[in-house]
From Swiss-Prot:
This is HTH-type transcriptional regulator GadX. Keywords: Activator, DNA-binding, Repressor, Transcription, Transcription regulation. GO terms for molecular function: DNA-binding transcription factor activity; transcription cis-regulatory region binding. Homodimer. Residues 162-183, 209-232 bind DNA. Coiled coil: none annotated. Induction: Expression can be activated by RpoS and repressed by CRP, H-NS and GadW, depending on the conditions. The lineage of its organism: Bacteria, Pseudomonadati, Pseudomonadota, Gammaproteobacteria, Enterobacterales.
Amino acid sequence: MQSLHGNCLIAYARHKYILTMVNGEYRYFNGGDLVFADASQIRVDKCVENFVLVSRDTLSLFLPMLKEEALNLHAHKKISSLLVHHCSRDIPVFQEVAQLSQNKNLRYAEMLRKRALIFALLSVFLEDEHFIPLLLNVLQPNMRTRVCTVINNNIAHEWTLARIASELLMSPSLLKKKLREEETSYSQLLTECRMQRALQLIVIHGFSIKRVAVSCGYHSVSYFIYVFRNYYGMTPTEYQERSAQGLPNRDSAASIVAQGNFYGTNRSAEGIRL
């Protein structure tokens, strides 16, 4: 398999297992070892049932679930390209994830299950101090992703350019400049994040319009409706009615989830123990 930059690989050794690095080095693992690695540094040419390739898009979804200190990108002279966690018992879901990963025509429910199971596997490494540096080194998130991560960690907060810049350990002027280089702004990203969350709360969770407005940081329901109508071309109530009738909307909830904007109401990410 060709090495892919921006992707990661999770391998599970049920028995003794060998991975070959792109530099020709061999890494040996014992049964029960779960491996997280930079896919661009690994050669995988057999035993596909032993690994799961995690795309950049999926990694970008996992990033906002981490605590905010994970966003502080410090320079690391040397970052390991591979981490190992020895599991004391078998991981029955790994085979399912591997099978789902080989299927190119997943149903919507299967897509969500695959993503959830991958997140569970990634969470095994959360207590490893080298995990976040490796994840960020592979992903190298742009400023848009980092700003959206801050916003989505507390969607209802009264965010300002200065506050977001403070969270990212930079000056407001520098943040504004970097966002301009990516042809966006903090206010545009704030609206995007809030509108995407609003859609999920309305269509998926069935929240009332007033509750959605408050949950997304709007003190005025009428202003929330105004922003929603400008963004989606219809009011929240009209969107609810069309969704209930199965009519197509400009941006369906399913497509927003599929494109990587699905966040639960609980923002914490607790690692599972194996």
